Amino acid sequence: MNLSATEKDLMIVNMGPHHPSMHGVLRLIVTLDGEDVVDCEPILGYLHRGMEKIAENRTIIQYLPYVTRWDYLATMFTEAITVNGPEQLGNIQVPKRASYIRVIMLELSRIASHLLWLGPFMADIGAQTPFFYIFRERELVYDLFEAATGMRMMHNYFRIGGVAADLPYGWLDKCLDFCDYFLTGIVEYQKLITRNPIFLERVEGIGVIGGEEAINWGLSGPMLRASGIKWDLRKVDHYECYDEFDWEIQWQKEGDSLARYLVRISEMTESIKIIQQALEGIPGGPYENLEIRCFDRERDPEWNDFEYRFISKKPSPTFELPRQELYARMEAPKGELGIFLIGDQSGFPWRWKIRPPGFINLQILPQLVKRMKLADIMTILGSIDIIMGEVDR
């Protein structure tokens, strides 16, 4: 192969799949001319587990524990979209109390996800101290999750028609205490990071995406809102009970890594506002719509037989998906998380297509890093916020 004089000096570097700044098993084949990036090719699939095919061989109830392994840092959202699709398909009403509980859990999960984005992002660009601070607040969120669901991660809490269990006694007060404390933590981050001249030097003007370009690439979430597009599915689709709360879409117009950082920091403050309003206005009533549980009616148990006395021996609830198709979506921390669902009058979905926000947002990476310095790859990739579990599925 005949190489030109300039091409002979190019160097090909493999970043990942075990590089700490790759945020999982992502591999980048980077072509360098000195310190300048000439080309970048992401290699995906190291964490592919066949999540869509697994869904087509399980009932919705059986599949719920699997979905927390997509985006394993924002598991409430993967559970929510998994039950929202069948609920819309079957026109199932969710009790008001269950909807409020869902909103509280989703916004707490958004905060936890943004916190675990912020710490490693700062570590990627050389600031180690905030990495330890974010774990302090994140532990408090996980303590709340553990008290309500029994699990710190992989909660398996959402159900078709509601949630698995009501909130325990005293949980609402503890959550309100956390909200008050966390607002002071955000002020601390602002002082420590936002006005830091070294941090600003690393992120300002790096990885700029224009508004029209962001739409053409199909970007969503903070990636889209940081480019000047005020688009948030909580306002657009009016799902759950977000319309009952007073909050604003957070956006920036610069489109660089700093803008994406500012959007996520502001979103945490808005999430606290939503949680506080939900905690103060949460109604009483049931936490699950039990009428939709279609039990096996063939064996009608006698009042005194073994099946009747031992509730654990009840048949498993199965929900038949109507013969329809549907695209359900919601605003996850990383962007638009959606599923395309086709039912065929059986307990198993005929098709279950996942639309992961991280996978779509990652597609613009090669374009963003071209003509940048090698060290800027970590900044740009960190600002995109990916989790390989949902990218590879």
UniProtKB/Swiss-Prot annotation:
The keyword Plastid applies. It is an enzyme of class 7 (translocase). It holds the Pfam family Complex1_49kDa. It comes from the Eukaryota. GO terms for molecular function: NAD binding; oxidoreductase activity, acting on NAD(P)H, quinone or similar compound as acceptor; quinone binding. Its EC number is 7.1.1.-. It is found in: Plastid, Chloroplast thylakoid membrane. It catalyses: a plastoquinone + NADH + (n+1) H(+)(in) = a plastoquinol + NAD(+) + n H(+)(out); a plastoquinone + NADPH + (n+1) H(+)(in) = a plastoquinol + NADP(+) + n H(+)(out). Gene3D superfamilies: Cytochrome-c3 Hydrogenase, chain B. The keyword Transcription does not apply. Its main location: plastid. GO terms for cellular component: chloroplast thylakoid membrane. One of its GO terms (biological process) is photosynthesis, light reaction. It is a peripheral membrane protein. Keywords: Chloroplast, Membrane, NAD, NADP, Plastid, Plastoquinone, Quinone, Thylakoid, Translocase, Transport. Belongs to the complex I 49 kDa subunit family. PANTHER family: NADH DEHYDROGENASE [UBIQUINONE] IRON-SULFUR PROTEIN 2, MITOCHONDRIAL (PTHR11993:SF10), NADH-UBIQUINONE OXIDOREDUCTASE 49 KDA SUBUNIT (PTHR11993). NDH is composed of at least 16 different subunits, 5 of which are encoded in the nucleus. NDH shuttles electrons from NAD(P)H:plastoquinone, via FMN and iron-sulfur (Fe-S) centers, to quinones in the photosynthetic chain and possibly in a chloroplast respiratory chain. The immediate electron acceptor for the enzyme in this species is believed to be plastoquinone. Couples the redox reaction to proton translocation, and thus conserves the redox energy in a proton gradient. This is NAD(P)H-quinone oxidoreductase subunit H, chloroplastic. It comes from Gossypium hirsutum.
